[in-house]
Swiss-Prot record:
Pfam families according to UniProt: RemA-like
Top-level taxon: Bacteria
Family (UniProt): Belongs to the RemA family.
Record field: compositional bias (Acidic residues): 78-105
The protein, known as: Putative regulatory protein COPRO5265_1186
Stored HAMAP family: RemA
């Protein structure tokens, strides 16, 4: 999960390595954080006019707004992580077993 990008909707992506948290914007403290970030020029609105459903907190102090639910974003992250695990290079031992059996490991 350290590299790559996360699709946050409408062909917009964010670097996975910069994400600190993904939260719902419904609570008063998060709404206050969003307002302050906007005042300070640290808000990125990627909702394309849709309802804000997730606020993504980043390392640099920026907040990125998304129209995609936090649960959906997290499941996309988990899918990406699982795919990375499946595409990891196989070990030498696994390659030998694959050659012997003629099947994929």
């Amino acid at each position: 999960m350290e590299s790559g990008f996360l699709n946050i909707g409408f062909s917009s992506y964010i670097s996975v390595s910069k994400i600190i948290g993904i939260v719902s914007p419904d609570s008063a403290p998060i709404r206050r954080m969003i307002r302050l970030a906007k005042e300070q020029g640290r808000l990125v609105d990627a909702t394309f006019g849709r309802r804000t459903r997730a606020a993504i907190l980043t390392e640099g102090g920026f907040i990125v707004l998304s129209a995609v639910l936090p649960d959906t974003l997290v499941s996309r992250l988990e899918e990406e992580e699982e795919e990375e695990e499946r595409t990891e290079p196989i070990t030498e031992q696994e390659a030998e077993l694959e050659e012997e059996s003629g099947e994929d490991v």
